[in-house]
């Protein structure tokens, strides 16, 4: 039996500023299967995304995202206020882009952002949060949403 695999190129995942949608990536796998390194590669190949937020339940223990993202944008646990602030910022950015486009026929604002939810399942209340549903379902407001979890715990009901 021969298995043919195509080479996967991270650059093919589109996060272009002029597109009105962004991908949602859900990485599922057992512990130590490389999920964090896939996220790191995505961030490396898309360093031009101007801002992002990381919510990581294991950041205090391993400091993984502190090497990639300014600590100001890293949170150790899920809180509804974090998502509210992200949504509020994105709405403001999109409103400003609309104003500039009406006034000047173009805008120089890059609306892209990323949200990484990493190992947040120790408290699964976030999976039932209405704001999280909005975050996952409204891709036009974000460049990318990445959720990294272990399949055993993954019980989304959208």
Where are these regions (language model features)?
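Intrinsically disordered, low-complexity eukaryotic regions enriched in glycine, serine
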Residues: 4-5, 55, 72-74
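Short acidic-hydrophobic, aromatic-tinged amphipathic segments that line or gate anion-handling sites
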Residues: 71-82
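Conserved SF1/SF2 helicase motif Ia
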Residues: 48-49
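Pre-Walker A adenine-sensing motif
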Residues: 2-19, 40
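Short, aromatic/basic amphipathic alpha-helical patches
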Residues: 63-72
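An amphipathic, basic-hydrophobic helix/alpha-beta surface used to engage anionic
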Residues: 52
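Conserved P-loop NTPase motor cores
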Residues: 12-14, 23-45, 57-61, 80-158
């Amino acid at each position: 039996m021969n298995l043919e695999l195509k080479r996967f190129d991270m650059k093919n995942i589109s996060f272009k500023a002029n597109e009105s949608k962004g991908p949602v990536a859900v990485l599922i796998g057992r512990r130590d299967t490389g999920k964090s390194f896939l996220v790191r590669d995505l961030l490396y190949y898309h360093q031009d995304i101007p801002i992002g937020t990381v919510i990581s339940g294991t950041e205090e223990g391993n400091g993984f995202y502190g090497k990639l993202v300014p600590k100001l944008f890293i949170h150790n646990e899920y809180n509804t206020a974090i998502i509210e602030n992200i949504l509020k910022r994105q709405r403001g950015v999109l409103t400003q882009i609309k104003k500039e486009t009406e006034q000047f026929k173009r805008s120089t604002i890059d609306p892209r952002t990323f949200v990484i939810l990493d190992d947040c399942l120790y408290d699964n209340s976030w999976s039932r949060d209405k704001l999280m549903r909005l975050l996952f379902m409204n891709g036009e407001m974000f460049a990318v949403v990445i959720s990294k979890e272990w399949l055993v715990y993954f019980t989304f009901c959208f």
